[in-house]
Amino acid sequence: MSDRIQAITMPKWGMTMTEGKLAGWLAGEGADIAAGQEIMEVETEKITNVVESQGQGRLRRIVVSEGATAPVGALLAVLATEDVSDSDVEAFIASYADRAGSAAADADDAPKARIVQAGAHRFKVLSLGSGGVPAVLIHGFGGDGGTWLFNQDTLAQNRAVHVIDLPAHGDSEPTVASGKVTDIADAVLELFAALDIEKAHLIGHSLGGAVALAIAETSPQRVQSLSLIAPAGIGAEISANYIDGFLAAERRKPMKDVLSLLFADPQGMNAEMVENVLRFKRLDGVPEALAAIAGHLMADGKQIIDLRAILDGKIPALIVWGEADQIIPASQSDGLPAGVDVARLAGAGHMPMMEEAAQVNRLITAHLGKAEG
Amino acid sequence: MAQKSFRQALNEALHHEMRRDPNVIVLGEDVAGGSGASGQKDAWGGAFGVTKGLLGAFGPSRVRDTPITESAFVGAAAGAAMTGLRPVAEIMFVDFLGVCFDQIFNQAAKFRYMFGGKAVTPLVIRATYGAGTRSASQHSQALYPIFTHVPGLKVVIPSSPYDAKGLLIQAIRDNDPVIFLENKVLYDTVGEVPDGAYTVPFGEAHIVREGGDATIVALGRMVHFAREAAEILAAEGIDCTVLDPRTTSPLDEDTLLEMAEETGRVVIVDEANPRCGMAADISSIIAEKAFGALKAPIMKVTAPHTPVPYAPNLEAAYIPDAKRIADAVRKAVAFKRS
Amino acid sequence: MTGLQLSREELLKAYRLMRMIRVFEDRVSAEMASGDIPGNTHLYAGQEASAVGICLHLSESDRIASTHRGHGHCIAKGCDVDGMMAEIFGKDTGICRGKGGSMHIADLSKGMLGANGIVGGAPPIACGAALTSQILGRNDVSVAFTGDGGINQGTTAESMNLAQVWKLPVIFAVEDNGFGEATASSFVVAGEITKRAEALGMAFAKVDGVDFFAVHEAAGEAVERARRGEGPTLLHIETPRYYGHFSGDPDNYRTAEEKAAMRRDRDCLPRFRRRVTEAKLLGLDELDKVDAEVQAAIDQAVASARSAPQPALSSLTTDVYVRY
């Protein structure tokens, strides 16, 4: 495709997404668009999020209007430089092969998550991409691989990227009875063996950040780099309201209130997202497993695991934090040693990889490149 | 996640709970597949195949074919529940509860209250309900309003395989008598169902779909028609919330009122007859407690005040459908105060 | 007669229970007339030998399910008399916190699964209790009390069939007091009650319900049969009913002569006294002492019921569900 004329298409967020609704255009026809500029808002059954433009140019034509639903891959709008004629834009639209969307065609060869037996553990793993030093993405407390909905595709452009569900999370069985972060880290190392991973970039969010640090503590030779997003384990403060509220919430309303603490702007949450968290929490064994993890993570409202010393600058480390994080304050990224890169993002809460997905993807991509170079 | 049928989801729930708790028993007509005959064992696995495999897994003491005497075995299930078992009694058709209603509404439902809070009656009565199978007036009714009316009973009406499994496990673990109604047209519908055991709490409505223009409240099979109507309406630019209360007793009034207030227009779909039905009940609650938020009269889409007919064209006209639901929503949206 | 081989303690216990039932019912009748008992009652006086003759074989883990005429069964199965009286007065200290009244007295901890306002209510429940015992491998039996009215109910017929095909450890105690409400059983019961059991292949016995020892012996065989896993038994127990159907029933469908003869000739208490004293098993003084103690206990029960508080209004909506 010529750089002079580019398609803006319906993104695919996660395996189950087949279509999305164009909730709103954030720029009108004729506007000049910079790369990375927020251009539209897309709503799926699970989530609503803004989409940033990959390329730059003038927004010449909006093909799918606000409120309409389009399949994944469908042409939504056309970006082109000024010198492209209107008739060329029309021709581009007319010829756009994938105008109807590729979701149906892709359904069969779409990557599928698998269950990987690793010692006593059974992990759900979704792998994308190939080559390079692989990256392993580790979600946070009470989360699952869906955390990385907006990241895995992008990060997998030039390497294998494994999104895992931690034990007792998502579709992984509760095989770590103790709930200790170190035991979870050992389980993930067993998964490394099962996946033939010698060394990996560890990308961890919140509790997943602490798990990544615990792996780096015992097995630094297995860690190419650390990318930690609002990690647990490097400071004392944590929102007991969130952790206790999450453990206690059994119904939609209280769960919605608790989950809204995760985001700087909770408007993107919808009923489906809350329902999915509740479905996870209703599984036999999950509440007990979560309580065990929480019991090792904090006491009297303070974190009780301290892995801050691991961030000594020897392993390349990137820390990303949302300024508006209400779960673990961004100030815990202050005062880290030189050699640890820190990025604090305005406009994001505890979930910057969702709320500021494009920016986080750029930061991590650059960090991984640097750590390999 | 695995795709499973509504029937399989229920079957898994029974397997999970019978494995988990030796006090869980299953009894009813042909639930062990048809005992005492010369042919294959567990041939039927219940009239609708829901209990298939339980006999082999748990044996004839805990999985019992009964005589066709609903009073005796439902009453015995109530007595067994009061004395330490967790019986799951299967009644082929909810219509047959007519011959054992005393056991349910005079006995099981009231033990706890009458006895000053000392009795616990963890009884589940499963039954099919609903029209659409050319089964006519005595095998097709949607009698859940009758049970909803009785204090002491809980009433569950799952609409999806996921809910069917989680609600049945909750029903079996619940310490109160539960009437669990399965729409027989839904048995072969398929959806995502986790392999493990899980519960869906009672009194928690499911927001099936979110939209700002109107709220369609629907139960059981009607949820599917409500979704269908919502899709039709979405193409016209009318965005509907579809709300499935999942249980009529307890009823999630909070979510009903929240959605009524958010959208200002409410259409209630009920496969039951209209008089003293769920549509009437829910509409009275909303009218009383969310009147100020209403932009249009509450619309009810129900079966007519008739028994269920046999002839296919009559039966089709009896059951609410997506077209009637969509029409009601359009009417609500078009309503102007004069 | 084998019943006479009972120990002195057991004989005294049987007499005390029978006397307790009689005095309880006579007193309830008197208190009903005073207007302080809010609801209706159906009195068991005259039938005492049946309840006591059967329940003397039962332990607390055995269960009984009863009828609207249930006070006697409750007392015989060990329910607290103070709590029963308070219940009938509708008080907070009642055995059901004042929520059940005379027709729903129950104490599950004593194996008493409830009096029952529905004629034919007990048999399915007793079958259920027997099913619990059978499935859990316990040795407990259950007793369904019903009557010449209840024997005609479909629930009883269905339950007898179920009990027989499943060999449930249950006894159907059919107390035939001659009347279903105001209608004579001879008018509404077809054939012989025991034949209904016979038709199902069920063991049965017909006994004189005025004779404690006869009831006790027949019940003993039935209970042992059930405990041996040999299934149910029907006991057809013929008794008088001293009062009308309910307290305050003018009972004018029976002649005064018939009622007088019934009380004179068919009273289980003097018959018991005569038998045990003639056999020199108990002395009259011992029996009289029991009478005095029972009278004092009932006086006490009434006094404490009268002075007990009403249930709190907040309890109107509690205990509908375990959790809602």
What spans do the regions from the language model cover?
Chain A
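Mobile cofactor-carrier "swinging-arm" domains
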Residues: 1-114, 118, 123
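Short beta-to-alpha linker loops that shape the active-site pocket of alpha/beta-hydrolase fold enzymes
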Residues: 45, 165-170, 175, 232, ...
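Active-site loop/oxyanion-hole signature of alpha/beta-hydrolase fold enzymes
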Residues: 118, 162-203, 207, 362
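Conserved HGGG/HGGXW glycine-rich cap/lid loop of the alpha/beta-hydrolase fold
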Residues: 127-171
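Flexible "cap/lid" loop of the alpha/beta hydrolase fold
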Residues: 213-217, 224-255
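Conserved alpha/beta-hydrolase catalytic His-Asp/Glu region
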Residues: 249-311
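Conserved loop-alpha-helix segment in the C-terminal half of the alpha/beta-hydrolase fold
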Residues: 313-348
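Catalytic histidine-centered segment of alpha/beta-hydrolase-like enzymes
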Residues: 348-361
